[in-house]
A protein has these predicted regions:
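Short, compact, well-ordered microdomains
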Residues: 2-4, 63-93
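Short, structured beta-strand/loop micro-motifs enriched in basic residues and often containing a Trp
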Residues: 4-13
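A structural detector for beta-sheet-dominated domains
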Residues: 12-14, 30, 87-89
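Disulfide-bonded cysteine motifs in exported proteins
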Residues: 13, 38, 70-73
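Acidic, aromatic-enriched beta-alpha/helix-loop junctions
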Residues: 28-65
């Protein structure tokens, strides 16, 4: 039996009215670890709001299995709304 391997996850900014992000910014996670070199700013308010979905995506749970067409979530800090999409990816070696 092979060992389970988590998915790497990136958060892509879909839209933003916040000065911390612009559309297209990305945040990269390798397991529970943030890739600081590749990532844009990290807002803990936003991340905390939808972290359970990030965790599920890391464990290879798909958007469809979670009941969504895509994993797009909004930061709850009003009025500076930011929409993030969670994307599972694998490094090409």
């Amino acid at each position: 039996m092979s060992e389970f391997k988590e998915c790497k996850v990136k958060l892509v900014v879909k839209s933003s009215k916040c000065e911390l992000y612009k559309s297209g910014d990305e945040i990269y996670l390798d397991g529970a670890v943030l890739n600081k070199e590749k990532s844009a700013n990290v807002c803990l308010t936003a991340i905390n709001a939808f972290y359970p979905f990030i965790y599920a995506a890391r464990k290879r749970v798909t958007a469809e299995q979670m009941g969504f067409d895509e994993l797009t979530f909004q930061c709850p800090d009003c009025p500076e709304t930011v929409e993030f999409t969670i994307v599972q990816y694998e490094d090409i070696e």
